[in-house]
């Protein structure tokens, strides 16, 4: 179920503060965040966030197409190695 429209998008307050500070400083450095649940807002376009995936911060460059999505969608937490190959099928 999606979030109610009247509530508006959820963003952790520290993410907003860090983004605002980065805009004011003018530097284009990676902003480290741990809030995968926060929504990407239009004011984040052009910034680079380091989204934590449980092991390291994955750099994510924010574009206009990402507005309304969550930060966690761009930082996968699981690594897929593929299914184990069938040894009997390889021998033939």
Swiss-Prot record:
UniProt cross-references to PROSITE patterns, sorted A to Z: RIBOSOMAL_S19
Keyword RNA-binding: yes
GO biological process, one term: ribosomal small subunit assembly
Highest taxon above the source species: Bacteria
Annotated GO CC locations: cytoplasm; small ribosomal subunit
Keywords associated with the record: Ribonucleoprotein, Ribosomal protein, RNA-binding, rRNA-binding
GO molecular function: rRNA binding; structural constituent of ribosome
Pfam families to which the protein is assigned, alphabetical: Ribosomal_S19 (PF00203)
Function: Protein S19 forms a complex with S13 that binds strongly to the 16S ribosomal RNA.
Protein's UniProt name: Small ribosomal subunit protein uS19
Organism: Roseobacter denitrificans (strain ATCC 33942 / OCh 114) (Erythrobacter sp. (strain OCh 114))
């Amino acid at each position: 179920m999606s979030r109610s429209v009247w509530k508006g998008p959820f963003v952790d307050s520290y993410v907003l503060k860090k983004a605002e500070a980065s805009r004011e400083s003018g530097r284009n450095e990676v902003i480290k965040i741990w809030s995968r649940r926060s929504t990407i807002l239009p004011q984040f376009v052009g910034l680079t966030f380091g989204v934590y995936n449980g092991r390291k911060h994955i750099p994510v460059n924010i574009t206009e197409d990402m507005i309304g999505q969550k930060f966690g969608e761009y930082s996968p937490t699981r690594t897929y190695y593929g299914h184990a190959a069938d040894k009997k099928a390889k021998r033939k």
